[in-house]
């Protein structure tokens, strides 16, 4: 039987993407929790270039970067496909995955920065949400009729954005401003709950990093 290990963090959206894909494929794996303040020799050895999680170790071979790992899992293991079969649809899925990956940083900066940097990040986040809201006007998934590669990569905009909003009191996505995006997010979280980490645990984790907005100011 193939040996599969995943170096990651339980509350990281990047690790979560990989766990989700492994569960879709029905792959048994060992999860090794990392401490990013005290990185293990295994992590440093497995990802000597970036020294970041997640890292998938499959039969002693190391694969880094969550989007690269997702494609590897789809090709290396049997089970339901994560990427579409049609070449055009595959290209489309990769396009949207790259878009949300590139633009998603602004969402995180909206909660983890201050002052002018935070305001600029919010504007960039609103622009991304506007584009996604338009994209989900007539569909529930990025490509086709089932959640797949691009949707998994968009977990930061779906699941984790809601967590950050609840913890911080800063709300970026409202149904008044972005009704289609919010409908997609609701469906996303309902349909894929079995693949998600504990919401309560995520709230506890992120409350340790984010101070809520003081509404009295």
From Swiss-Prot:
GST N-terminal domain ranges (all copies): 2-81
Domain of life: Eukaryota
Sequence ranges assigned to domain GST C-terminal in this UniProt record: 86-210
EC number: 2.5.1.18
Glycosyltransferase found in the keyword field: no
Induction: By fungal infection.
Keywords: Pathogenesis-related protein, Plant defense, Transferase
GO biological process: defense response; glutathione metabolic process
Enzyme class: transferase
Family: Belongs to the GST superfamily. HSP26 family.
Protein's name according to its UniProt entry: Probable glutathione S-transferase
């Amino acid at each position: 039987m193939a040996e599969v290990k995943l170096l990651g963090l339980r509350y990281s959206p990047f690790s979560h993407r990989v766990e989700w894909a492994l569960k879709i494929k029905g792959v048994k794996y060992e999860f090794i929790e990392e401490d990013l303040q005290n990185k293990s020799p295994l992590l440093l050895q497995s990802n000597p270039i970036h020294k970041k999680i997640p890292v998938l170790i499959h039969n002693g071979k190391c694969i880094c970067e969550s989007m690269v790992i997702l494609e590897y899992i789809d090709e290396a293991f049997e089970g339901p496909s994560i990427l579409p079969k049609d070449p055009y649809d595959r290209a489309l899925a990769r396009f949207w995955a790259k878009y949300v990956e590139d633009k998603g940083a602004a969402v995180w900066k909206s909660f983890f920065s201050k002052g002018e940097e935070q305001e600029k990040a919010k504007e960039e986040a609103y622009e991304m949400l506007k584009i996604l809201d338009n994209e989900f006007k007539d569909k529930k998934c990025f490509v086709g009729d089932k959640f797949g590669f691009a949707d998994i990569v968009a977990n930061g905009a779906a699941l984790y954005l809601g967590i950050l909003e609840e913890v911080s009191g800063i709300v970026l996505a409202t149904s008044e401003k972005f009704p289609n995006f919010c409908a997609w997010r609701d469906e996303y979280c309902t349909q894929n709950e079995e693949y998600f980490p504990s919401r309560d645990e995520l709230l506890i984790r992120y409350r340790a990093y984010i101070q809520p907005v003081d509404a009295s100011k």
